[in-house]
């Protein structure tokens, strides 16, 4: 991969978000005004493709303690967490403590299309071979 800055990668990822790359569970809440909504899983996987590191996951809770869902982001080395989608959450949603998640050998069917859509857009914008690991 040609040398890229994290700032450049972040800009490209954010510009590539769309309803097509949104988690199906969040599609009804996705909008250009909240483009990060439902992008955390796809974004974390694409950043992991590009930069390696750990995948982090945490439950997201409503004020009554019930679970809204899960949130995913990245850690690169000790103390450097990158969460491009944290702003997606409403004030009533709280991200809990994270744990490291092993990357699945294959992306699950539920979000595979969304991940591939984001990966294709990001790799094209960065002029990378979409078939590279």
Model-derived features with residue positions:
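A structural boundary/capping signal
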Residues: 1-133
């Amino acid at each position: 991969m040609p040398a890229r800055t994290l700032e450049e990668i972040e800009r490209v990822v954010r510009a590539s978000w769309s309803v097509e790359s949104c988690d199906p569970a969040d599609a009804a809440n996705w909008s250009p005004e909240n483009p990060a909504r439902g992008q955390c899983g796809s974004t974390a996987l694409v950043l992991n493709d590009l930069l390696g590191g750990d995948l982090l996951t945490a439950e997201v809770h409503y004020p009554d303690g019930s679970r809204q869902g899960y949130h995913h982001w990245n850690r690169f080395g000790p103390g450097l967490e990158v969460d491009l989608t944290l702003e997606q959450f409403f004030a009533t949603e709280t991200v809990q403590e994270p744990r490291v998640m092993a990357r699945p050998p294959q992306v699950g069917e539920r979000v595979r299309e969304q991940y591939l859509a984001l990966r294709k857009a990001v790799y094209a914008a960065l002029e990378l071979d979409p078939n590279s690991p």
